[in-house]
C-alpha cells in the first residue's frame, strides 16, 4: 500500500470466461477452449512501449462520473477520513479488528472487467469496507448477462456495467469513493486507468491481449495483482483454486498467459508472484440452444456494432453459471483483502 493511500482515505470509495470467444485464435494455442478466448496477436518485446504496434484495438472511453473529464481526482479533492468506524462494519470489525477496517477504508482497489466475476468482486469489496474503488469495463449490459452478472437485470439492458455497479456500491457503502469508467483497457488507456496507482488490482478482463498487458504493467510497476482465468464451461465450484501462475493445472488460458509474459521478458521469476484463480474441472462442451437450432445464432447484445466482443465474431460460446463465477470472485476478493490487511495481520 502506498504511503499516500495510507494517509488519505478515499472516503467516497467475465473474468476471462470460456464464454467469451473470438474468431481469431492464437497461433500457439491448440486447445479448443483457449482458442475460444479473445486472442489478439501480442508482439514480442520486454517493454510496454514495444506493444504499441500490436494493439490496434478499438477504444471507447467515457468520462469519469465525478469529475466530468478524463482527469483523475487528486488526494486533496477526496473527502477526509471518518473519525469513527460506522456500525455497519460491526461484524467485520469483530473479524479483522478496528485497525484492519481502517486500513481497508484507506485502500484503493481497481477492478478491471465487471462481468460474471468482476461484478461479484466489486460487491464483495464494497461489503469488505474498501474505501475507494475504480471500476473499469467498456461494455453495456446484455440480456444474456442476467444469469451471472449482479448488475444485469431485464430492466438494465443497454446500460453501462460500470455505472450500474457504482450505484450498487454506493447503496451498500455510502462513504466509498467510486470511479466508474467505461473504457477498454489497452496501451492507449493503461496509464490513465492506473493513475493514481491503486494499492491492488483485480484482473477479470475477458480479452487476452489486454490481460497480458495489464499483468505485465502491474509486474513492472510493482502493483499487487490477482488474475482470474476461465470461469466458463464449468459446473463444480469445489474445483476452484488459487495458485501462482507458474503452478496451475488443466487451465489452458494460464498456459497462454505464461507464454506471452515470457515473450515480454517476464519469465518464471517474473510470473512467480502472480496469483491466479482457476478451475481444475475439465471443460464442458456447450449445448446448442433450441433457438440456435431453429434459426441459427443471432446476437441480441446492445450496441454490438462498436463492441470489441460482438457475438458474431465468436467461434464458440460456452455456458456459464453464477455459482461458478461467484466462486471465482470470492476467491479473488478473499486474497485481495488478506493482502491489504497483511501489515496489520499480526496485531
Spans of model-derived segments:
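N-terminal charged helix/coil linker that caps or initiates catalytic domains
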Residues: 2-14, 20-110
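Conserved N-terminal Rossmann-fold NAD(P)-binding element of oxidoreductases
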Residues: 112-113, 136
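Hydrophobic/small residue at the entry helix of a nucleotide-binding pocket
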Residues: 117
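Conserved S-adenosyl-L-methionine
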Residues: 127-132
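Glycine-rich phosphate-binding loop and adjoining beta1-alpha1-beta2 segment
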Residues: 137-173
